[in-house]
């Protein structure tokens, strides 16, 4: 039996977790980034694919402009609720679509070189890293790609691959000092 979808949100203070204001739309497989005082949650499944985006201010979630492509299992990169990226994910198959968040709205930007579902994501809007995930056809990949918004059109380029291909990873850190697990 599958667990029910939840909007539960918990905040870490360095020693303990505290239940805080729940997401307005309960879901799973959403992409999120930020801090305990400034975060963003986008997309997911509730149980249908959703494009819903919510912004966190440290005490409550507020629904803001939706992403352009509803999906689940996208990779996230961002440091707060004012800017960030989501990339890849799953609609009716794995996708390479990347969208950037300006603090107000989402814009589709250059796609990743490869489709991937449930990649690890880390970094910021300016410099992000997508690692591993599941490719079209269902196989796990170890490939990585780096995002650089300063390139003429903001683009992904190949980076060194992980040692082991896998999916459903979490990521943390920056583009140049990240972790995937």
Q: Each predicted region: which residue ranges?
A:
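Polar, enzyme-active/binding microenvironments
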Residues: 1-181
């Amino acid at each position: 039996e599958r667990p029910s979808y939840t909007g539960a949100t918990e905040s870490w203070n360095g020693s303990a977790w505290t239940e805080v204001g729940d997401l307005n739309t309960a879901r799973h497989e959403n992409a999120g980034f930020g801090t305990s005082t400034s975060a963003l949650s986008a997309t997911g499944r509730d149980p249908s694919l959703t494009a819903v985006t919510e912004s966190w201010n440290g005490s409550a979630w507020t629904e803001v402009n939706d992403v352009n492509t509803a999906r689940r299992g996208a990779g996230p990169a961002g440091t707060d609720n004012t800017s960030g990226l989501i990339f890849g994910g799953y609609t009716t198959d794995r996708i390479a679509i990347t969208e950037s968040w300006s603090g107000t709205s989402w814009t589709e930007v250059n796609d990743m070189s490869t489709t991937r579902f449930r990649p690890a994501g880390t970094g910021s809007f300016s410099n992000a890293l997508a690692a591993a995930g599941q490719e079209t056809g269902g196989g796990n990949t170890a490939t990585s790609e780096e995002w650089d918004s300063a390139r003429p059109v903001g683009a992904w380029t190949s980076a060194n691959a992980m040692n082991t291909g896998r999916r459903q990873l979490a990521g943390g850190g920056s583009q140049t000092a990240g972790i995937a697990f």
